[in-house]
């Protein structure tokens, strides 16, 4: 009993002192080689939102979704071979999530000094992601977002904790996820299909998505 207590105290001390094993970013980068086929090398996603942006996403959100794919509690057939059959370990999930969360995509084209070669310029430009503005009533979108969405997703849409970043994400991808929530094909947190989204009109959702495209420049 005394030994067990001492061991527990030792573990607690190590955790407090920061000795918990950190994510292996090199391993995460290696795993991303598989993800890049759909989501691109820098995690921008692709095919105009058929594959979502995952770069800069909240680490806890990425971890949770990968575990959901692996357990098949979130249905996404293209993801099954990479999570279930490959048997993505908890450690792998931790590593790839940390790697992706650390990728920063600018919302403005880089300023070149004139000393860069062509390859360097190309690599710099590839780390830029600008979501086209979508149409909608920005004032209404801001009002609804700040009142009903910001509490979880943050005032600037960057997300927090297990709640995902929305700003900088493809508009048609976000709309597709909203549709899945409303149909009950994807649970919205613990609400199921009952909650904020069900109380919004289609025009309100359009306005919120338009508002999100208008504030991406603040993501610096």
Language-model features: where?
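Bacterial N-terminal signal peptides
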Residues: 8-17
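Electrostatic cytochrome c docking/interface patches
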Residues: 18-32, 45-50, 113-144, 162, ...
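The canonical Cys-X-X-Cys-His
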Residues: 33-41, 96, 141, 148-155, ...
């Amino acid at each position: 009993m005394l030994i067990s207590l001492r061991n527990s105290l030792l573990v607690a001390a190590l955790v407090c002192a920061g000795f918990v094993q950190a994510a292996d970013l090199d391993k995460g980068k290696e795993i991303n080689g598989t993800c890049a086929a759909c989501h691109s090398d820098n995690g921008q996603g692709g095919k105009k939102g058929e594959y979502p942006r995952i770069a800069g996403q909240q680490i806890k959100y990425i971890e949770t979704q990968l575990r959901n794919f692996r357990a098949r509690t979130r249905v996404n057939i293209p993801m099954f071979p990479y999570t279930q059959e490959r048997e993505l370990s908890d450690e792998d999930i931790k590593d790839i999530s940390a790697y992706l969360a650390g990728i920063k995509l600018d919302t403005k084209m880089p300023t070149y000094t004139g000393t860069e070669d062509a390859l360097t310029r190309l690599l710099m430009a590839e780390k830029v992601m600008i979501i086209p503005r979508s149409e909608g009533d920005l004032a209404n979108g801001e009002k609804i977002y700040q009142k009903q969405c910001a509490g979880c997703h943050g005032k600037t849409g960057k997300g927090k904790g297990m709640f995902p970043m929305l700003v900088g994400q493809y508009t048609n991808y976000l709309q597709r996820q909203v549709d899945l929530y409303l149909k009950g094909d994807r649970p919205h947190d613990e609400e199921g299909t009952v909650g904020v989204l069900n109380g919004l009109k289609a025009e309100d959702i359009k306005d919120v998505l338009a508002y999100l495209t208008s504030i991406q420049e603040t993501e610096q």
